[in-house]
A protein has these predicted regions:
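N-terminal pre-domains immediately preceding structured catalytic cores
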Residues: 1-201
Length: 201
């Protein structure tokens, strides 16, 4: 298959701009998430390993298979959020990370045209806030639906809002974790640089 060498501008190599670089195919439809029931949230909390529930301080735990982010404080559940995760082939990375960067009103730079889209625009795929937690500088090959591309330089995965509310609860992103804008605002206010983030399969 042909490979297209894609050299991203420096601004596009930063946090999560890859997430919206390639159009997403529509996934199989699933019911839209409603407000989380207490049972759903408690089941998610029980799925968190005991050693994580016993950690002191603030900790963000993502349960990828349940498409939930839990904000724990010394093991107690502070908040739970439904999320969208990476699609097959672009899975959200698992492991132990920490908050690397926070941006209020992020500006998204289109990786090809260089056009800038500000937060106030409904076209901004990052929504209202950006919280980076994972950086990958190994590069990768990816398929955009028509051709192969080589991603060069560093890409960053993080939590961000979305103008497309219907995507929350689906495996549809290019690795980033999408939240409703009101939820990412709440998470943004509560975490700091260095806050631990654990992503479980």
């Amino acid at each position: 298959m042909p490979f297209l060498k894609n050299v991203l501008p420096t601004s596009a190599k930063r946090a999560g701009y890859l997430d919206s670089m390639i159009p997403s195919p529509l996934p199989e439809p699933i019911p839209l998430l409603q407000a989380a029931s207490i049972d759903t949230v408690m089941a998610a909390l029980v799925a968190v390993p005991k050693q994580l529930r016993q950690k002191p301080g603030l900790h963000v735990v993502m349960l990828r298979d349940r498409r939930r982010v839990l904000l724990l404080e010394s093991g107690a559940l502070r908040q739970a959020f439904p999320v969208a995760i990476g699609m097959p082939g672009w899975e959200t990375p698992t492991g132990r990370f920490k908050v690397l960067e926070k941006i209020d009103n992020p500006v998204w730079v289109h990786p090809v045209s260089g056009d800038r889209v500000a937060d106030q625009s409904s076209a901004n795929p990052l929504g209202s806030h950006w919280i980076a937690f994972h950086r990958d500088c190994l590069g990768r090959d990816a398929h955009d639906g028509e051709t192969w591309i080589t991603i060069e330089g560093c890409t960053t995965t993080g939590f961000h809002g979305t103008p497309h509310r219907w995507t929350v609860g689906r495996a549809i992103s290019h690795g980033c974790v999408r939240l409703y804008n009101e939820d990412v605002r709440s998470l943004y206010r509560q975490v700091n640089l260095g806050t631990p983030v654990t992503v479980l399969p």
